[in-house]
Swiss-Prot record:
Key word Thylakoid present: yes
Family the entry assigns: Belongs to the Ycf4 family.
Name assigned to this protein: Photosystem I assembly protein Ycf4
Origin: domain of life: Eukaryota
GO biological processes: photosynthesis
Organism: Capsella bursa-pastoris
Keyword Plastid listed: yes
HAMAP family with a match to the protein in the record: Ycf4
Gene Ontology, cellular component aspect: chloroplast thylakoid membrane; photosystem I
Localisation: Plastid, Chloroplast thylakoid membrane
Length: 184
């Protein structure tokens, strides 16, 4: 989602609050909870859940392994829910032609670098760079090349843009910033 005027362009970044992340966190939580309950029921020798009779799963080694997978899955699920709660990766890119300043803001993990804020002059922007790698794991990334700071990614790799959409966005941004486009 973006907002544009004659001299200002604001590009909003979604971050980790995506439908796919909610689905994965929920599925992982339920699956790992199931593994932990089956491991616990095999340890106790009673049916904690009535899907499997406890006599079919022996505690050593199946119950221990299922309990371990359940605990590990709960930790990973907790991590996913925390990234969703903190909305890690969300923010905005603000390009202001009137002031000649570019501001990039992202939310990070709690701590000293919770707020990631980059600010530089438009005259330091060398080019807009498109990096496209096709194949099994296709990767399309849009970078902004900054003099003295290297390349700063503007579009995340997990956003499923087609090559045409990336090219369109790069062309519009390069036209707005009045810089060339490089393709790799």
């Amino acid at each position: 989602m973006s907002w544009r005027s004659e001299s200002i362009w604001i590009e909003f970044i979604t971050g980790s609050r995506k439908t796919s992340n909610f689905c994965w966190a929920f599925i992982l939580f339920l699956g790992s909870l199931g593994f932990l309950l089956v491991g616990t029921s095999s340890y106790l020798g009673r049916n904690v859940i009535s899907l499997f009779p406890s006599q079919q799963i022996i505690f050593f080694p199946q119950g221990i392994v299922m309990s371990f997978y359940g605990i590990a899955g709960l930790f990973i699920s907790c991590y996913l829910w925390c990234t969703i709660l903190w909305n890690v990766g969300s923010g905005y890119d603000l390009f202001d032609r009137k002031e000649g300043i570019v501001r990039i803001f992202r939310w990070g993990f709690p701590g000293k670098t919770r707020r990631i804020f980059l600010r530089f002059f438009m005259k330091d922007i060398q080019s807009i760079r498109i990096e496209v790698k096709e194949g099994v794991s296709a990767r399309r990334v849009l970078y902004m090349e900054i003099r003295g700071q290297g390349a700063i990614p503007l579009i995340r790799t997990d956003e499923n843009f087609t090559t045409r959409e990336i090219e369109q966005k790069a062309a519009e941004l390069a036209y707005f910033l009045r810089v060339p486009i490089e393709v790799f």
